[in-house]
């Protein structure tokens, strides 16, 4: 292992473990001192890669224990264990997809079938809740504003990121169903996953990348989150995945792996109240290590191991330079303003860096 990567690995492991509590995985240890579904579920993938299975299953169990009767899991749970199901006025979609993905990964790594059997009914409710958000019955999910991870950007309709997670959740639920002896259910969800993948390619593919989202019109900005997930999950074939990597290099989005989008979203895509607190760049032209780490795994899966390792070295040097695994970067530095500061001990990034180093 490269010395910079080893040093960064040690820092990331320290930061990640500092976010583990008796209840699960916190989003961070400073101003993000709470449990957030997308953060915890993505972080559980890193926990599993490290053999930290207790942190993984406790995080999954925490959110499923507070699942609403209709199947929605909490968006956020406070440090005092009070659940919140909305972001502003919206019920985010990705937590429900990610809890299924986390369950499948936990089964694969920990081989704990008993835990899956215990939570299968809750998983089924979670995936059925997601299916209910295909409002126009075209197999793709529709969402209102603020329902995905880019909570400061006004997007609505069919969003690439959410639909890639939906595809993966359908595939993984099919595996869970088969594991508990529900073969017919497994076959149903495997078929549905294939059809969703076909629809993503039909609706989103632009010839050399997937568009960002489809509302009243098609928004053809390049979002690295969904494009990387499409390559990682096998929605994109080998040729498409290479085109996505070409697009990333063309716009130098891997200088700080990985810049979230290109080009910049216009100012009117950010709610005015957030502009007032310096949030213009929070999800707009900024860089997030979790996307870079998943991209390094995607590159490795494509056989581009040299490029994958280089991406990890770039991330590692920034981790060493800052002495911790920060949340979000702009122009090579952690975001820091009067109102907005990057979380310095960010579990989502640190856990996926650990996963990427273990797999690349």
What kind of feature is each model-predicted range?
Residues 119-134:
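An active-site-proximal structural segment forming one wall of the substrate-binding cleft
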Residues 33-41:
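Beta-strand-rich domains and repeat architectures in extracellular enzymes and scaffolds
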Residues 55, 115-118, 122, 185-188, ...:
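Alpha-helical positions within canonical tetratricopeptide repeat
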Residues 1-34, 58-91, 132-158, 195-288, ...:
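Extended glycan-interaction surfaces of carbohydrate-active proteins
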Residues 31, 47-51, 83-94, 110, ...:
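Short coil/turn segments at secondary-structure boundaries
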Residues 161-203:
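Active-site neighborhood of glycoside hydrolase catalytic domains
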Residues 1, 41-53, 98-115, 165-183, ...:
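Well-ordered alpha-helical scaffold segments within catalytic/enzyme domains
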């Amino acid at each position: 292992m490269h010395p910079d990567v080893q040093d960064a690995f040690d820092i990331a492991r320290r930061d990640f473990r500092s976010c583990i509590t008796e209840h699960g995985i916190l989003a961070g240890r400073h101003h993000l001192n709470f449990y957030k579904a997308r953060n915890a579920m993505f972080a559980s993938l890193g926990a599993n890669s490290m053999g930290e299975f207790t942190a993984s299953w406790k995080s999954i169990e925490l959110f499923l224990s507070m699942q609403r009767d209709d199947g929605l899991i909490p968006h956020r749970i406070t440090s005092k264990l009070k659940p919140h199901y909305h972001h502003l006025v919206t019920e985010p979609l990705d937590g429900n997809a990610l809890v299924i993905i986390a369950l499948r990964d936990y089964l694969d790594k920990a081989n704990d079938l008993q835990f899956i059997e215990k939570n299968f009914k809750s998983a089924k409710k979670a995936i059925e809740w997601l299916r209910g958000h295909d409002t126009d019955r075209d197999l793709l999910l529709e969402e209102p504003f603020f329902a995905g991870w880019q909570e400061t950007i006004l997007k609505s309709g069919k969003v690439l990121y959410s639909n890639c997670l939906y595809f993966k959740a359908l595939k993984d639920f099919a595996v869970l169903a088969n594991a508990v002896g529900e073969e017919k259910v497994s076959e149903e969800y495997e078929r549905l996953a294939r059809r969703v993948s076909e629809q993503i390619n039909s609706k989103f593919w632009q010839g050399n990348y997937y568009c960002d989202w489809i509302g009243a019109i098609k928004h053809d900005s390049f979002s690295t989150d969904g494009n990387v997930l499409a390559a990682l999950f096998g929605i994109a074939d080998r040729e498409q995945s290479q085109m996505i990597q070409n697009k990333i290099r063309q716009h130098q989005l891997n200088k700080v792996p990985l810049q979230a989008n290109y080009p910049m979203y216009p100012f009117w895509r950010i709610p005015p109240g957030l502009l007032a607190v310096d949030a213009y760049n929070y999800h707009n032209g900024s860089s997030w290590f979790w996307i870079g780490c998943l991209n390094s795994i995607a590159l490795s899966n494509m056989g581009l191991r040299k490029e994958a390792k280089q991406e990890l070295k770039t991330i590692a040097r920034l981790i060493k330079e800052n002495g911790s695994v920060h949340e979000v970067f702009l122009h090579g530095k952690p975001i820091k303003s009067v109102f907005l500061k990057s979380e310095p001990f960010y579990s989502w990034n640190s856990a996926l860096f650990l996963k990427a180093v273990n797999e690349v």
